[in-house]
């Protein structure tokens, strides 16, 4: 279910958008406002996934509303739907942080397609970030950005891409033994290669030193088998 806030001063268009998306297409919970001031209040109270807004509205226009929202909320998807079609208007919207600009007139199916494409993209980005972020004792590994964050001290350490790859594999299989050749294959695209194996030992020693701040965390060597990230 997509929670959608429509901010539109045209009563008939607002009704058509709400009815079509909520009742005909389905999968939407639609909240409506008639101007930017009401839109800001609804955004605060309802916390929508998507805001679809006109620009030329009374009290606070679309530009003013988005500027206010983007001061504290960079996540909500914002789409302008407007008859203002000059390049300057379009550029102004994107400078403020909107995600898309649909020129009036348009049909509800077009709006639905834009909304769902942006929601899918946003959820995919969030899923990727969450998938590659791991809690390891007092640490948080962000494998996407090769950083290790100490939640206790607030210190952030940049590690190498290879170190991030290795720790990522171990964190995915926390408290389980991961075969050395599996790590070598994923990180170096080789199996039991001597030089890659020695490089792995060097990286493991560096990671052990980085994780030493938390006694409950350690990387164990299981002789003849592989490595194990142990956490309590």
Where are these regions (language model features)?
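Receiver (REC) domain active-site loop signature in two-component systems and cognate sites
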Residues: 57
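Helix N-cap/capping motif at the beta->alpha junctions
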Residues: 18, 32-41, 62
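Short, Lys/Arg-enriched segments at the junction into DNA-binding effector domains
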Residues: 116-175, 181
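Short amphipathic alpha-helix used as the core "switch/output" element in two-component signaling
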Residues: 41, 63-74
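Two-component/phosphorelay signaling modules centered on CheY-like receiver
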Residues: 10-31
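Positively charged, aromatic-enriched patches within helix-turn-helix-type DNA-binding elements
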Residues: 155-159, 165-215
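DNA-binding patch around the recognition helix
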Residues: 126, 131-134, 158, 202-232
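Basic, amphipathic DNA-recognition helix from helix-turn-helix-like DNA-binding domains
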Residues: 72, 77-135
């Amino acid at each position: 279910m997509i929670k959608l806030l429509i901010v539109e001063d045209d009563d008939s268009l607002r009704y058509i958008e709400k009815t079509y998306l909520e009742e005909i297409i389905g999968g939407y919970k639609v909240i409506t406002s008639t101007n930017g001031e009401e839109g800001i209040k609804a955004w605060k109270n309802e916390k929508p996934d998507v805001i679809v807004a006109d620009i030329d509205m009374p009290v606070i226009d679309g530009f003013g509303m988005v500027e206010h929202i983007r001061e504290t909320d960079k996540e909500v998807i914002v789409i302008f739907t407007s008859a203002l079609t000059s390049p300057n208007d379009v550029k102004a919207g994107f400078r403020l942080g909107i995600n898309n600009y649909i020129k009036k007139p348009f049909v509800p199916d077009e709006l639905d397609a834009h909304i769902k494409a942006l929601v899918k993209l946003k959820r995919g980005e969030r899923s990727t970030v969450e998938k590659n972020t791991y809690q390891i004792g007092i640490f948080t590994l962000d494998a996407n950005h090769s950083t290790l964050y100490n939640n206790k001290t607030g210190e952030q350490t940049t590690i190498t891409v290879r170190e991030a790859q290795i720790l990522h594999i171990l964190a995915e299989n926390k408290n389980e033994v991961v075969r050395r050749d599996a790590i070598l294959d994923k990180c170096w695209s080789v199996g039991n290669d001597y030089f890659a194996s020695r490089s792995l030992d060097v990286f493991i020693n560096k990671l052990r030193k980085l994780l030493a701040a938390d006694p409950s965390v350690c990387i164990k060597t299981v002789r003849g088998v592989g490595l194990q990230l142990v956490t309590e």
